[in-house]
Design a protein with these regions (language model features):
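N-terminal secretory signal peptides and thylakoid transit peptides that target proteins
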Residues: 2-17
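Short alpha-helical segments used as structural interaction elements across diverse proteins
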Residues: 5-6, 20-21, 54-57
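Bacterial Sec-dependent signal peptides at the C-terminal "C-region" and cleavage site
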Residues: 17-30
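Mature catalytic domains of secreted/periplasmic carbohydrate-active enzymes
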Residues: 28-515
């Protein structure tokens, strides 16, 4: 069958329309979905009572490790799909290094995923030093390969590849350091995403020869698709049978039960309505069981409608909210490609730090992915970025952790660039000395100067008789600077004479004591 090629961005763009439309259709009740008893049942009305735990609001910064069999070729994200799309660079690379897809498919890539340099304890030390308060492990990507000791599929990291319980090892390392632990599931769409593996070349010496996804021996990896399955790939649950929905529920429930994540991330909207709602209720109820009746777990969805009235945390992939959101939210983004890609351009440390401050000022958290290569060891450029974040957080993290938004998130040219939700980060420029961002903690206001001022910093929103009614300022400090500052507050704003040496690269933080 001919399969249409969608990019990740265009596929995710279908979420806003397709999923709500599907949900308006009356769903038949799913039977036999056993969940932990507790305060929630698997309905939207019940889940409206959910409230985001304070630890998540305080944490602000998490690190994610996209890692799995697709990391082994080191050719970037969606390799297991793109390698079956004739003409795609991944298709060509696969033929050059493995052979024709009709003979050597993704199943044959999996044994090359060794993780021979994987050291979760060392990695977690680096992540913690960089200031991450929570860590995310890949649970299962669209490639249908579980990174834990799964009892629902032989295609898992304990049975093949590195032959280790990757989720379990990451969890142990994170919890030992007092970090919260999250897992991501991208499984729900795998049924459609892997449809290309059932195709064949249109041209060349193997034209018409079916790819290895057509072999019944491989259906437990590539899925047993009907011969008349729709050729067009769409990011929704149309055409996905109830048997797969139930399998998804059982498999992710197994992940939740055995690894008790503090955060569960779905790549997309909450899947399969009643199946998904019951899974979220199970996650929350099990958390309440383990925490004396208090729900400490978090579930994230990328669909605004899922999170409008409690239920879960809204996640923006490679984007951010336009303004201060009333409820906590999260940006998930990457220093480069989601899965490891050789020689790709990475975000600079300044870009990453700008994003963190900007996001926190709007009531959000940043989840930053450092993709691991197949070996399981970070590359030198990733280590350099982590080192810069570590240095910056050592000076400025007081203005990040456990803070809340102020009356406005900021001032300056960067505030005029709209957030607009998902996939907008490429249109944003690094912030400059003309930009300021704000956070608060009690009677302390933190003003982040996003670039180093020449001599004097002027923070206009902190004017003595301005519209924001700041009131009288009692004291001003510069985080990381031991000396006293000369400052005044008048109708033009807060004016601070800056020292000759800046206490940190990138953004610097004024600690303002309000009256």
């Amino acid at each position: 069958m001919g399969i249409m090629y969608l990019t990740r961005r265009s596929a995710m763009g279908l979420l806003a329309g397709a999923i709500p439309a599907a949900r308006r259709a009356a769903a038949q009740p799913a039977t036999g979905l056993e969940i932990q008893k507790g305060p929630f049942v698997g309905t939207r009305d019940s889940l409206k009572a959910y409230r985001v735990p304070e630890w998540f609001r305080d944490a602000k910064f998490g690190i994610w490790a996209h890692w799995g069999p697709q990391s082994a070729p080191e050719q970037g994200d969606w390799y297991a799909r793109k390698m079956y799309i004739e003409g795609d660079p991944a298709y060509k690379w696969h033929q050059q290094h493995f052979g024709p897809q009709s003979k050597v498919g993704f199943k044959d890539v999996i044994p090359t995923f060794k993780g021979e340099k994987f050291d979760p304890e060392h990695l977690m030390d680096l992540y913690q030093k960089a200031g991450a308060k929570y860590f995310f492990s890949m649970g299962v990507h669209h490639d249908n390969f579980d990174m834990w000791n799964s009892r629902h599929t032989r295609w898992n990291a304990v049975n093949m590849g590195p032959k280790k319980d990757i989720v379990g090892l990451f969890r142990h390392a994170a919890l030992k350091r007092g970090m919260k632990f999250g897992v991501s599931e991208h499984l729900w769409i795998s049924y459609k995403w892997f449809g290309v593996s059932h195709d064949s070349d249109k041209t060349g010496p193997y034209a018409g020869v079916p790819y290895d996804g057509n072999d019944p021996q491989n259906f437990d990896l590539y899925h047993d698709l009907p011969k008349d399955y729709p050729a067009q790939f769409s990011w929704d649950d149309k055409g996905i049978p109830d048997s797969w929905k139930r399998h998804w529920f059982d498999r992710i429930k197994d992940l939740v039960d055995n690894y008790q994540p503090d955060i569960l991330y779905t790549d997309g909207a909450l899947p399969f309505e009643e199946y998904g709602l019951n899974l979220v209720a199970h996650l929350y109820n099990d958390s309440a069981r383990r925490h004396g009746g208090k729900v400490e777990a978090v579930y994230t969805s990328k669909l605004k409608e899922d999170c409008a009235e409690g239920t879960c945390v809204l996640d923006f992939e490679r984007g951010l909210a336009d303004a201060i959101a009333p409820n906590p939210w999260q940006t998930d983004t990457c220093v480069g490609s989601w899965h490891y890609q050789r020689d790709i351009k990475y975000k600079s440390p300044k870009t990453v730090i700008d994003m963190l401050v900007d996001i926190v000022s709007r009531n959000g958290n940043l989840l930053l992915n450092f993709p691991l290569p197949g070996s399981g060891a970070l590359d030198d450029r990733e280590l350099a970025i982590l080192a810069e974040i570590t240095k910056w957080m050592a000076v400025n993290s007081e203005g990040i952790y456990a803070t809340r938004p102020w009356k406005i998130f900021g001032e300056g040219p960067g505030t005029k660039v709209k957030g607009t939700g998902r996939f907008n980060e490429n249109g944003r420029q690094d912030l400059t000395a003309e930009d300021v961002r704000f956070t608060t903690k009690g009677k302390t206001l933190y003003a982040f100067l996003m670039g180093w001022p020449a001599k004097e910093a002027v923070v206009a929103p902190l004017a003595a008789k301005g519209k924001l009614e700041v009131g009288k300022i009692r004291n001003v400090e510069l985080l990381g600077h031991k000396g006293k500052l000369k400052w005044t507050q008048d109708e033009a704003g807060l004016k601070v004479e800056m020292p000759e040496e800046k206490p940190s690269d990138h953004a610097v933080t004024l600690k303002v004591a309000l009256g």
